[in-house]
């Protein structure tokens, strides 16, 4: 039976929902005369899916008919799911019609491996050429590079798309070999290096000739699945830092593994996605990108997992409490970034404003400093610090101020997303959810207070 365009869209949009490497553009180029669409740095429109994930653009697969059999993937060839494939013309027309109706502002295009990586990429390139050359589409395009694609095709794709991405998927070669035997380390990192080198060459050409063609002007990103394999948070964070430094990635996305396969090599189907762990990885990733932290400072070989109760920055501050309090009127910019409650924008405002006069609490509050957390780590004009002292009451006070409220948020939805295992166990034993949260919170407060 021949599938309608709407049937294909329903199947292939649903098949793409597990790919989270999709965000606002990061590239800026205004509309040109005679073209349709524009791409601005603030990014394309965003939408929230039913499961709470933020997605943007028309996110769809070219095909979900896959020649690979990655055990963690819903589109693997051995899985019995509805299959569909767009023709290049169908997908190009669908994108441009959605754009004209103001449904979307760009396209996120990926695909299962239809036959071979090169054949799949050639079909994706046909879509991009139709959009750019025939329909004169000037909007944002994020294209997924298929591992194993030839360098020539990747080069062509880079001049048609605003951003490219190659998904690492699993954090180690051993896990790739076990769960995705059709993929290998070389097939992933070779195109990643090629995109990095080509992007740098393109930027250098633009300094000499402003009309030189741009290669993936919004850079590249990748995605890792968290919880499908046994790698620790420390291992994942080390890998992310290495990719940022070696390949100049714009983003590393983390996706909590959602069980889709009854496979003994994977977590059981009733396993809850590790959403709190995913959340902590994003927080730590932010510290790497914007707060001048190193991966070894956030986690180390002796502590390879994130603290479930404190965010990574607060956890670092508690572990290094001897470095505090810092005088915000004298502390180096790098140290200001490490104070809980002070972000990059607030740190820059403090650095600029203190040249004119000494700052007090009122000024810090106006600059966006979160004093509820920062007060335990700073001194300033007219304020000598709200330090916990040596008593247990003081230690509990700072712990209660720093503990992550998301872990103990009330309500079934938040409980299912962020509750630590201890809360789940108490609820299963018949303890009301709110009471279970209070009990675990008090135990966590006591443990963290003793660590100060």
What are the roles of these predicted feature ranges?
Residues 1, 214, 234-245, 275-277, ...:
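Long C-terminal interaction/binding lobes of large macromolecular proteins
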Residues 1-65, 370, 378, 386-452:
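Flexible, acidic/Gly-rich N-terminal and inter-domain linker regions that tether
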Residues 1-68, 72-222, 226-230, 243, ...:
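Conserved Radical SAM active-site core
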Residues 204-212, 254, 294-300:
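Flexible, glycine/charged-enriched surface loops at secondary-structure junctions
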Residues 233-257, 262:
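Long, internal scaffold/assembly segments composed of regular secondary structure
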Residues 265-337, 373-422, 426, 451:
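Long, highly charged, low-complexity intrinsically disordered interaction regions
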Residues 353-354:
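Residue-level signature of tetratricopeptide-repeat
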């Amino acid at each position: 039976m021949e599938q309608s365009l709407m049937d294909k869209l329903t199947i292939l949009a649903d098949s793409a929902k597990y790919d989270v490497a999709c965000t606002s553009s990061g590239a800026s180029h205004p509309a040109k005369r005679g073209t349709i669409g524009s791409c601005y740095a603030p990014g394309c429109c965003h939408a929230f899916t039913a499961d709470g994930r933020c997605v943007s653009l028309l996110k769809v697969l070219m095909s979900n008919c896959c020649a690979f059999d990655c055990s963690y993937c819903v589109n693997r060839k051995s899985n019995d799911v509805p299959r569909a494939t767009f023709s290049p013309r169908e997908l190009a027309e669908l994108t441009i019609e959605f754009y004209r109706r103001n449904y979307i502002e760009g396209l996120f295009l990926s695909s299962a491996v239809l036959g071979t990586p090169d054949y799949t990429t050639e079909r994706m390139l046909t879509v991009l050429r139709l959009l750019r050359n025939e329909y004169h589409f000037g909007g944002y395009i994020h294209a997924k590079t298929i591992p194993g694609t030839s360098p020539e095709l990747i080069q062509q794709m880079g001049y048609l798309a605003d951003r490219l991405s190659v998904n690492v998927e699993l954090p180690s070669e051993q896990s790739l070999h076990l769960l995705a035997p059709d993929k290998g380390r070389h097939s992933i990192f070779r195109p990643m290096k090629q995109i990095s080198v080509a992007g740098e060459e393109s930027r250098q050409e633009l300094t000499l000739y402003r009309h030189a063609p741009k290669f993936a002007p919004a850079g590249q990103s990748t995605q890792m699945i968290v919880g499908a394999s046994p790698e620790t948070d420390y291992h994942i964070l080390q890998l992310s830092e290495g990719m940022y430094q070696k390949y100049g990635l714009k983003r590393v996305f983390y996706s909590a593994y959602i069980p889709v396969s009854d496979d003994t090599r994977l977590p059981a189907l009733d396993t809850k996605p590790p959403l709190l762990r995913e959340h902590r990885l994003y927080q730590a990733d932010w510290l790497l990108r914007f707060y001048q932290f190193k991966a070894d400072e956030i986690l180390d070989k002796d502590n390879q997992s994130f603290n479930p109760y404190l965010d990574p920055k607060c956890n670092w501050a508690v572990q290094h409490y001897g470095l505090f309090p810092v005088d915000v009127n004298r502390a180096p910019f790098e140290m200001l970034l490490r104070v809980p409650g002070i972000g990059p924008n607030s740190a820059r405002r403090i650095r600029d404003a203190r040249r004119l006069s000494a700052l007090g609490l009122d000024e810090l509050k106006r600059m966006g400093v979160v004093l509820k957390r920062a007060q335990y780590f700073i001194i300033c004009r007219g304020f000598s610090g709200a330090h916990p002292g040596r008593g247990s009451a003081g230690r509990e006070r700072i712990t209660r101020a720093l503990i992550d409220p998301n872990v103990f948020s009330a309500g079934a939805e938040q409980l299912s997303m962020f509750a630590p295992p201890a809360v789940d166990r108490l609820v299963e034993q018949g303890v009301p959810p709110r009471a279970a949260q209070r009990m675990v919170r008090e135990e966590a407060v006591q443990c963290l207070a003793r660590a100060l």
